[in-house]
Amino acid sequence: MPHAVALMVQGTTSDAGKSTLVAGLARVLFRRGVRIAPFKPQNMALNSAVTVDGGEIGRAQALQALAAGLEPHSDFNPVLLKPSTDVGAQVVIHGRVALSLSARDYHAYKPTAMAAVMASWDRLVTAYECVLVEGAGSPAEINLRDRDIANMGFAEAADVPVILVADIDRGGVFAHLVGTLELLSPSEQARVKGFVINRFRGDLGLLQPGLDWLEARTGRPVLGVLPYLHGLFLDAEDALADARAEKGETRLTVVAPVYPRISNHTDLDALRLHPQVDFRWVGPGQAMPPADLIVLPGSKSVQADLAWLRAQGWDAAILRHLRYGGKLAGICGGFQMLGGWLHDPLGLEGGAGSIAGLGLLDMETTLAAEKRLENVCGTLNLPRSPAAAGYEIHMGVSRGAALDRPALQFADGRGDGALSADGQILGTYLHGLFDTPAALSALLAWAGAGEVESVDLAARREADLDRLADAIERHLDLGRLFPAEWVRG
């Protein structure tokens, strides 16, 4: 049976450019007619996406699937860890919640996780011409090397060649590359076929002596120096993107708190990128600034994040905001916070118990063991009934009179969320609430912006994937990585 061409991208650090490089290479090969799939053995992220087979994977792999012209599938990210505390995480295997484990217990569970990884790998390499693999963090973390399934442990088991990427914009790129290589075992070093330097800006001629030294020092080629691509929009996996982009005159101010276990913050990308919206993240210790709209985003640990929000004094700021006529929206965990009570009888987010919500909507939420995972579409219960589409990822079941006025009507007939009688507060389980152009325009009008231009996030994402692929084709030596027939032309 045919076996796919495989290549693994590992990085010297987190955010070195692994996800971006895999997405860009996937788009390059997709445009050349190659049947290509992305793969990340193990991902740790609170931003996830719903798959075509009813599971969830990291958003980076969903973006890479889009770059490859595919629907997201759970095999693209067979092990997803969703941290719920500083020392524990929910373990998602093949798209479904398997169990929750402490970091120490997960170490003992790794052989089971590795079996799931290899099962997905075996399916992909027989179904596609090429599989592009993304590592996690750095392969040189000494304390994580035992039973590693995310980096060289996987590369060795699957016999996959590796390229190493480093971010020169951070500084120290040569130390990162040489140091990482030297911390690997001899067999692992032999897998590293070359280096990619990411996010370079300046005169390449001034960098060339360093590249020559690196090649002489390591005996491995620099496969390319990728430029810093200003304004590139690709879904962030964990790190919050800079929200304060340079804009002209804005029509609306939107703020959102950054709680410790914030999840799926990409829900707010459309607001962050909108030219007429002044969007701001509000971090710990910061006062909630005056705004037209406050958005409470999703959370992986709703009770803990709500307690933390109160400790910041933001509950009082939200009440003050509403008294002055401001609008408030809650998405998923943020929606659950708006009710009277949150119950966790099974201790799914820590200790079993209940906590009072903000009391702004007449409803209560109970966390249940079964997670709802579904792509959905429908209409918003706002003027003109704009279309909305997105996905549900939640373990909570909400009940109460507030739900008699749903914020959305799904195509299957279900109502979702709540819209307060005075129209000030909107809550929903729909992730991607702002992504549909018609829904975005309607929500901005509801928040007080009036008629504003729309932003097509999907079109922007596609255009930036092509811009990334164009840069890779210009600056990377693809002939050293892939068969000649894929590279010609």
Swiss-Prot record:
GO process terms (BP): cobalamin biosynthetic process
Keyword Membrane: no
GO molecular function, one term: catalytic activity
Catalytic residue positions: C332, H431
Classification via CDD domains: CobQ_N, GATase1_CobQ
Claim: Disulfide bond is one of the keywords in the record: no
InterPro entries: Class_I_gatase-like, CobQ/CobB/MinD/ParA_Nub-bd_dom, CobQ_GATase1, CobQ_N, CobQ_synth, GATase_3, P-loop_NTPase
Gene3D superfamilies with a match to the protein in the record: 3.40.50.880, P-loop containing nucleotide triphosphate hydrolases
Pfam families listed in its UniProt record: CbiA, GATase_3
PROSITE patterns membership: GATASE_COBBQ
Keyword field: Cobalamin biosynthesis, Glutamine amidotransferase
NCBIfam families according to UniProt: cobQ (TIGR00313), PRK00784.1 (NF001989)
Family: Belongs to the CobB/CobQ family. CobQ subfamily.
Protein name: Cobyric acid synthase
Species of provenance: Aromatoleum aromaticum (strain DSM 19018 / LMG 30748 / EbN1)
Taxonomy of the source species: Bacteria, Pseudomonadati, Pseudomonadota, Betaproteobacteria, Rhodocyclales
